[in-house]
Curated annotation (Swiss-Prot):
Cross-link (Glycyl lysine isopeptide (Gly-Lys) (interchain with K-? in acceptor proteins)): G109
GO annotation terms (biological process): protein urmylation; tRNA thio-modification; tRNA wobble uridine modification
Pathway membership, UniProt: tRNA modification; 5-methoxycarbonylmethyl-2-thiouridine-tRNA biosynthesis
Record Gene3D superfamilies: 3.10.20.30
Main location as per UniProt: cytoplasm
Gene Ontology molecular function: any one: protein tag activity
Pfam family, one: Urm1
The protein's name in its UniProt record: Ubiquitin-related modifier 1 homolog
PTM: C-terminal thiocarboxylation occurs in 2 steps, it is first acyl-adenylated (-COAMP) via the hesA/moeB/thiF part of the MOCS3 homolog, then thiocarboxylated (-COSH) via the rhodanese domain of the MOCS3 homolog.
InterPro entries assigned: Beta-grasp_dom_sf, Mopterin_synth/thiamin_S_b, Urm1
PANTHER family: RURM1 PROTEIN (PTHR14986)
Family per similarity comment: Belongs to the URM1 family.
Species for this entry: Anopheles gambiae
Intrachain disulfide bonds: none
Amino acid sequence: MDDSIDEEVISGGSTITVEFSGGAETLFGGVKEHIVPLDGSKIVLLEEMLRWLRDHLLTGDAGLFLQENTVRPGILVMINDTDWDLMGETEYILQPGDHILFISTLHGG
């Protein structure tokens, strides 16, 4: 899978909710919740959505959110209130109406 995302992959159709908490929202312009369009006629993996978030919504340092093709350690990911480890992580197939929550556990001080 290449690093470029096809604009048609995540466009039109249904939506998913993406939420950031624990400071992760600062990487996305301070906005905690985003409604992301999802083309319900195509299979879209969470990995593709991560690239889409990086390319379209991320305003901070990408290295603080992503490491290679996944979320960096220290950021918990919940898919519909379930740990993404139980859902297939980046291979999870997004469904219309999904709620994806990113919680940063990294705190400065």
